[in-house]
Amino acid sequence: LMTGVESARDAYIAKPHNCVYECFDAFSSYCNGVCTKNGAKSGYCQILGTYGNGCWCIALPGNVPIRIPGKCHR
């Protein structure tokens, strides 16, 4: 049993101001790099998702910001 571990979730990783990391190639390694650099197990480019084309992370740590409903304030 592990203690003190933040919960992980699958979600769009967010930049500051509630914006997704945009991507344009579902087969690129860009999103996997962004996600794993932030502690996720993996990631990929979700094309035409809820927030357009954005990086979706698998098992992203709970302390990393995710895209939430509302505007992206660039």
From Swiss-Prot:
Propeptide: 74
GO cellular component: extracellular region
Alphabetized InterPro entries for the sequence: LCN-type_CS_alpha_beta_dom, Scorpion_toxin-like, Scorpion_toxin-like_sf, Scorpion_toxinL, Scorpion_toxinL/defensin
Subcellular locations according to the entry: Secreted
Pfam families: Toxin_3
Domain LCN-type CS-alpha/beta: 9-73
Tissues expressed in: Expressed by the venom gland.
GO biological process, one term: defense response
Cystine residue pairs: C19-C72, C23-C45, C31-C55, C35-C57
MF terms in GO: sodium channel inhibitor activity; toxin activity
Record remark: domains: Has the structural arrangement of an alpha-helix connected to antiparallel beta-sheets by disulfide bonds (CS-alpha/beta).
Family from the record: Belongs to the long (4 C-C) scorpion toxin superfamily. Sodium channel inhibitor family. Alpha subfamily.
Official protein name in the record: Sodium channel neurotoxin MeuNaTxalpha-6
Organism: Mesobuthus eupeus
